[in-house]
């Protein structure tokens, strides 16, 4: 992952970030197999939030063709379409990030904190959503990890008038990283169990 990140920084595809704090033994919440590794979320992908083009500038929205996701669009599944569109002018002038197919999205503000999705189309997002382009990581493993830890993110955001988490809090979150083949096996088992649960609900 570190080599892949260094390569992308060199190619100017992602920005160089400040080094995240080393993980101490006291921080580790539980034991993991020897073949796994504790990392921070910021180490396993390129994370970034979006922006909202000024609503008063109609040329940012009228006849727009670029999907612009708001956190209400997050569906705990795959995003195939969103209601709002923005223009190429908005994309070039408003610090928006293009999310690629397969990127993992998480809501950071208000009642939607911790809600997740996977981008099934190329899109942009507002500032209330943080997107991750995974590096040498199975995106569905990250998706299910974030989904399982929704309550953790909600607790992180507690305390203000409107609860919110920041990109900084997300990238510093601990993440148990198994080998890639094992990530695929874990996801396969999760989806097998989810299918079984849905069948039982129908009985």
Q: What residue ranges belong to the model's regions?
A:
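Non-catalytic DNA-recognition/assembly elements of restriction-modification systems
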Residues: 24-51, 180-188, 195-203
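A short beta-sheet element
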Residues: 70-72, 81-147, 159, 166
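Specificity-determining recognition surfaces
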Residues: 148-173
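Low-complexity, Lys/Gly-biased intrinsically disordered segments
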Residues: 23-24, 37-76, 92-94, 112, ...
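Extended, domain-scale alpha-helical bundle/helix-rich regions
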Residues: 1-20
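Extracellular/lumenal ectodomain signal focusing on beta-strand-rich modules
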Residues: 35, 43, 115, 172-174
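Short, well-ordered beta-strand elements within core beta-sheets of diverse protein domains
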Residues: 27-32, 130-134, 171-177
């Amino acid at each position: 992952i570190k080599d892949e990140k260094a390569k992308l920084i060199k190619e100017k595809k992602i920005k160089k970030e400040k080094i995240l704090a080393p993980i101490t033994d006291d921080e580790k919440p539980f034991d993991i197999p020897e073949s796994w590794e504790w990392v921070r979320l910021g180490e396993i992908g390129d994370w970034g939030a979006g922006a909202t083009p000024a609503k008063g500038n109609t040329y940012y929205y009228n006849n727009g063709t670029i999907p612009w996701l708001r956190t209400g669009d997050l569906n705990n599944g795959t995003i195939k379409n969103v209601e709002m569109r923005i223009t190429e002018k908005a994309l070039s002038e408003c610090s928006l990030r293009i999310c690629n197919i397969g990127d993992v999205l998480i809501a950071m503000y208000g009642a939607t904190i911790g809600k997740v999705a996977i981008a099934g189309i190329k899109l942009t997002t507002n500032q209330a959503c943080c997107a991750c382009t995974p590096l040498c990581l199975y995106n569905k493993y990250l998706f299910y990890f974030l989904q399982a830890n929704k309550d953790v993110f909600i607790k992180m955001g507690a305390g203000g008038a409107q609860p919110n988490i920041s990109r900084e809090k997300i990238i510093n979150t601990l993440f148990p990283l198994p080998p890639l083949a094992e990530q695929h096996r874990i996801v396969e088992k999760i989806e097998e169990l989810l299918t079984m649960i849905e069948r039982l609900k129908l009985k």
